[in-house]
Amino acid sequence: MSDDSPQRATGKANMKAVYGWDIDHVEGSFVEYTVDHLFGRVWEEGSMSVKERRLLLIGLCMGSGLEDVAGLQLDAAVRQGELDADDLRSIVVFLAHYAGWPRAAKLNMEVEKIVARMAAATDVDAGDDPDLP
């Protein structure tokens, strides 16, 4: 598919909505399918929001033992303003009961790293310098 096709443009726009960054260059079959089909069609299907689709994906990742991918989605959700620290922690507790405690424990480690980054960013935004006494 050409780089200027409507489907490619939709795929790129959806990737930006999901992850918060632009994909400038699409090269290779796997990336083309990812942009054109997954994000250009699958993420367009129906009327669900990005947040709703993301929550489904997080649940699926947890059920499949892909805590790292779930963590990536949670981090993107925070950066996109869809979830806050309380939401992240609630998701871990909820999924622990369905995906299992060991999987949730792994996800919780990812969540606490994200929450720490959020707190550090808030401190910097507020003018607090963690290096000053």
Identify the function of each model-found stretch:
Residues 83-108:
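Charged/polar, low-hydrophobicity segments characteristic of intrinsically disordered regions
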Residues 66-89:
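Mid-chain, well-packed structural core segment of small domains
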Residues 1-51, 74, 79, 103-133:
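Acidic, glycine/proline-rich low-complexity segments that act as flexible tails and inter-domain linkers
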Residues 64-71, 101-105:
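Short helix-capping/linker segments at secondary-structure and domain boundaries
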Residues 59-65, 95-99:
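Generic structural signal for hydrophobic core residues of well-folded globular domains
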